[in-house]
Amino acid sequence: MDRADLTSIPAQQQAWPGRTAELDPQPDHGEQSWVGRGRLEGKRALITGGDSGIGRAVAITFAKEGADVVIAHLPQEAEDAQDTVELVRAQGRKGEAVATDLRDAKANRELAAKAVELLGGIDVLVCNAAFQMTHDEIGEFPDEQVVRTFETNVFGPFWLTKALEDELRDGSIIITTSVQAFSPSEQLLDYAATKAALNNLAVNLAAELGPQNTRVNAVAPGPIWTPLIPATMSEKKVDGFGSDTPLGRAGHPVEVAAAFVFLASDEASYVSGTVLGVTGGKPIF
């Protein structure tokens, strides 16, 4: 992993939802850099937004640690999703993909049932799917975008957790929040609000599901180099993305995936109700 590549990301832009192959520089998802140690041996994981970026890195590292994986993705992301499935299967683990849009309760119930059918059960749920678009001021945020952002980012994890509550007894739920929940950017007004809501949801769920030994935690990434960035931000904002962190660079997806592996593993058996920041030094308090 060449971290120096991410100290000066050049200006670039993609059509939404973005493609991994078009990113410059190419991000590290752990394809070669991650060495598994059997920390998730035999576990079965459902990862939403698993086609690219953080979700792809979580899928790859989980597979390298011994887990079977189902990823959920939008139909528009089928090409990236298939690449991720092949990377999972290359580790000798079961990998499947389900195309869906998780903006309504029915779609989440159907995904839950399909994932259980494909893997025979679910031990780890990773709620990672997210939507964002940037605008310079509140008047520029279209109503339909705000609704979509909340439906995808907040309602989806709520409904999916509800559908898998019984399956996840003695299991683990990990929700992707963001440094934006703690230090919001005006250009991400709706997105930042959803991530703050997810922090609250994670803590609340940890309290409610603790008696059935379901651990619930959240990971709050900082600026991570994924297709979402050039697909939702202007070229000007992409130029030098992440260089404002104390570490002076954006993060690779695999650097965030390490937090998910820890929280899904037995090493985190007494960790629940927490938000773990992977932010390059940006504060999350």
Specify the residue positions occupied by each region the protein language model found.
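Substrate-binding pocket helix/loop in short-chain dehydrogenase/reductase
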Residues: D136-I138, P142-V147, F241
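Short C-terminal tail/terminal secondary-structure segment
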Residues: L6-P10, L23, E31-Q32, H135, ...
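Active-site helix of classical SDR
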Residues: T161, T194
